[in-house]
């Protein structure tokens, strides 16, 4: 810019010097002309007027140059101000970007803390005493986040307003100085060098304008990015609100599942204790049986007896008992399932009847009053009749069974979650009648007498008394289930009751009873 100023000064000086030379040359020519042509005063007047016109043109050029210099100084100062303001805005945007990063880091830290707190709360069984104490910390965190977001939004709005005001100032400045200033480069006064210098100045001004527009566009893009990031932050805050609202429901569900599992564990413990008690009783009964057999074997030395344990193994009896226990358990499961299905069918029927009654009532209410009384009487007569009652839970109709020490396989099967999990996590459980263990000692005496070897009254008419059978007929089952059960039972091997067996009278009664039990086990297999 100082080079351009020097060129303009040189142009003005050359113009002034040329005008002075022309004036001096005109004066000399006028003297010569006056010497040659004396008395011609009109030519002098014309020359004076031309000199005055030239001087006025020079003054106009000087005023234009001064005006241009003033505009140039104003442009330089405005460019400096704009560059300083743009740098300040860039610094502010950088600080805002750093603040946004810090806010995002805080949000990530809050997410991690919320996750850890949620996991800890799920692990804990007890809930807080009131909802206000539970949601106080979460509410304070959300309030602080919302305050920070509002402050950042206000800062962005202020920056946007300042940028808009500066853009308006630049527009007014351009309209004021550039539209009014239109220099004619084709005039004869300016030379080629001056026109080139003015073109360079215009190019520089255009470059400054382009740079300012680019910077303004960059600021606008940064503002758009900032608004997008704020929208993203708002979405994250909403997601956090939803997550915080869902946390108590998840904790309640977890506590309910924990309580259900605790109930199931307690039921399992009770069943295990009952099975242990049964095992202890069975071991005692086994010891009593062994002592009785030993007492029976200890007879006088005059009589020679055959030891039944040399050829016959007492485990055959236990195998028979195990198989019968399995059959009893299968029948019990089938009876329970059928009772449940009948119960569900009856409930559905009752629900449909209720829905039909409500629908009929609505239809009767829509009828005119003359017909309504007749239909209401019929409906009341039908409503007085009772609906079909629900089927009660099937109770165990057979006698309680003793588990022997050799039933390890059955104990492993019964300890599975399908058998021992009496309280399911859904809250549904089996009926107490079908799951309670009857530990009555008086009812077990009759069964213990059955487990002992059969006593033969007469050796001439010998009949073998078999073990207790599985209860086949249950009065609470429907006809279809009974037919299916009989079809399934026909496929299974049967025990023959009261079958006469020929025995050797030479053998003692204990050995004969063991042989009878072995024969019974063979028939069962």
From Swiss-Prot:
Region of interest called Disordered, as start-end residue ranges on this chain: 467-525
Biased composition (Basic and acidic residues): 479-494
Signal peptide as annotated in the record: none
GO term, biological process aspect, one: silent mating-type cassette heterochromatin formation
GO cellular component, one term: chromosome, telomeric region
Stated role: Derepression of silent mating type loci when overexpressed.
Other known facts: Present with 1910 molecules/cell in log phase SD medium.
Annotated protein name in UniProt: Anti-silencing protein 2
């Amino acid at each position: 810019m100082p080079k351009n100023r020097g060129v303009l000064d040189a142009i003005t000086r050359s113009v002034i010097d040329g005008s002075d030379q022309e004036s001096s040359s005109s004066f000399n020519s006028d003297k010569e002309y006056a010497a040659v042509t004396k008395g011609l005063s009109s030519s002098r007047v014309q020359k004076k007027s031309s000199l005055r016109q030239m001087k006025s043109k020079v003054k106009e050029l000087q005023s234009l140059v001064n005006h241009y210099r003033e505009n140039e100084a104003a442009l330089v100062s405005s460019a400096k101000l704009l560059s300083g303001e743009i740098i300040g805005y860039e610094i502010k945007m950088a600080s805002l970007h750093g603040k946004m990063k810090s806010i995002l880091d805080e949000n990530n830290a809050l997410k991690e803390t919320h996750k850890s707190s949620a996991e800890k709360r799920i692990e804990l069984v007890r809930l807080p005493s009131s909802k206000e104490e539970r949601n106080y910390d979460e509410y304070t965190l959300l309030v602080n986040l919302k305050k920070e977001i509002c402050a950042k939004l206000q800062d962005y709005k202020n920056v946007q307003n300042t940028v808009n005001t500066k853009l308006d100032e630049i527009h007014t400045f351009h309209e004021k100085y550039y539209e009014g200033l239109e220099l004619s480069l084709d005039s004869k006064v300016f030379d080629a060098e001056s026109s080139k210098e003015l073109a360079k100045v215009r190019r520089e001004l255009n470059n400054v304008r382009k740079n300012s527009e680019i910077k303004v566009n960059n600021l606008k893009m940064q503002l758009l990015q900032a608004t997008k990031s704020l929208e993203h932050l708002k979405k994250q805050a909403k997601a956090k609100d939803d997550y915080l609202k869902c946390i108590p429901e998840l904790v309640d569900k977890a506590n309910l599942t924990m309580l259900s599992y605790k109930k199931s564990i307690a039921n399992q413990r009770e069943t295990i204790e009952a099975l242990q008690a049964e095992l202890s009783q069975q071991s005692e009964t086994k010891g009593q049986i062994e002592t009785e057999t030993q007492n029976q074997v200890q007879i006088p030395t005059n009589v020679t007896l055959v030891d039944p344990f040399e050829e016959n193994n007492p485990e055959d009896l236990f195998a028979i008992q195990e198989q019968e226990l399995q059959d009893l358990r299968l029948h019990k499961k089938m009876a329970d399932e059928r009772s449940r299905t009948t119960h569900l069918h009856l409930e559905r029927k009752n629900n449909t009847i209720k829905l039909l009654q409500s629908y009929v009532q609505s239809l009767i209410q829509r009828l005119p009053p003359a017909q309504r009384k007749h239909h209401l009487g019929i409906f009341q007569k039908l409503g007085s009749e009772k609906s079909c009652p629900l089927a009660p839970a099937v109770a165990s109709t057979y006698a309680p069974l003793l588990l022997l020490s050799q039933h390890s396989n059955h104990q492993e099967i019964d300890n599975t979650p399908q058998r021992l999990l009496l309280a399911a996590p859904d809250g549904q459980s089996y009926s107490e009648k079908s799951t309670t263990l009857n530990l009555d000692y008086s009812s077990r005496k009759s069964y213990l007498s059955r487990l002992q070897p059969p006593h033969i009254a007469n050796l001439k008419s010998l009949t073998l008394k078999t073990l207790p059978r599985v209860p086949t007929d249950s009065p609470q089952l429907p006809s279809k289930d009974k037919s299916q059960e009989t079809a399934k039972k026909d496929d299974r091997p049967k025990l023959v009751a009261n079958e006469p067996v020929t025995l050797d009278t030479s053998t003692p009664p204990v050995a004969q009873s063991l042989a009878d039990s072995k024969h019974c086990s063979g028939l069962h297999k």
